[in-house]
Design a protein with these regions (language model features):
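Conserved catalytic core of nucleotide polymerization and phosphodiester-bond processing enzymes
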Residues: 1-174
Length: 174
């Protein structure tokens, strides 16, 4: 499977370079990701349809960590320490990581909406966990239903294999 290999990093980077060099035209990275430049931003469409955006993309010659020169993408980002705006390289592995993390978020968000629709009180989420408030005597049956709801794939990924496990207690534990 392509997404289990480093090859997808290069595919993501190549699609991003193509998109920046051809504004307005969509470029596929694998079967589920599409990159396109519009309104001075590089957009990546996730399987859910949600978009991830990088500001002011440009194609430049970049120096790799091992000293080689190669064509790459830079984007306008804010330094997390100085809060100053600067240009930084956007490499294929970062593009793919954004796709993976964004898609994981979309799966969890869909599950939270399903839980809410089923009448559960979602009080928090922490990374890949959802915290619910249920009556103590309903803990076991609620956990079974919650796992069923959380492992039902969304319409945009009908064949995606989802797994979940759970526990219930009076207090949150890690």
């Amino acid at each position: 499977v392509l997404f289990r290999s480093k090859a997808i990093w290069g595919i993501c980077e190549a699609a991003a370079i193509d998109a920046v060099q051809n504004p307005g035209a969509p470029f596929k990275a694998g079967d589920k990701l599409v990159l396109k430049v519009a309104k001075d931003a590089l957009w990546m469409k996730l399987p859910s349809g949600r978009l991830i955006c990088w500001q002011k993309p440009a194609v430049e010659m970049l120096t790799t960590p091992w000293g080689a020169q190669k064509l790459g993408i830079t984007v306008h980002t804010q330094n997390t320490y100085t809060r100053n705006w600067t240009r930084n390289a956007l490499i294929g592995s970062s593009i793919f990581q954004s796709a993976v993390q964004g898609t994981a978020r979309d799966f969890l968000a869909e599950a939270m909406l399903s839980l809410d629709k089923a009448g559960y009180s979602v009080i928090n989420s922490i990374h890949d966990e959802v915290l619910l408030l249920v009556e103590e005597q309903n803990g076991e049956s609620a956990m079974e239903e919650v796992i069923k709801l959380m492992t039902t794939p969304p319409k945009w990924a009908p064949d995606f294999p989802l797994q979940a496990e759970g526990w219930y207690s009076k207090r949150y534990k890690k």
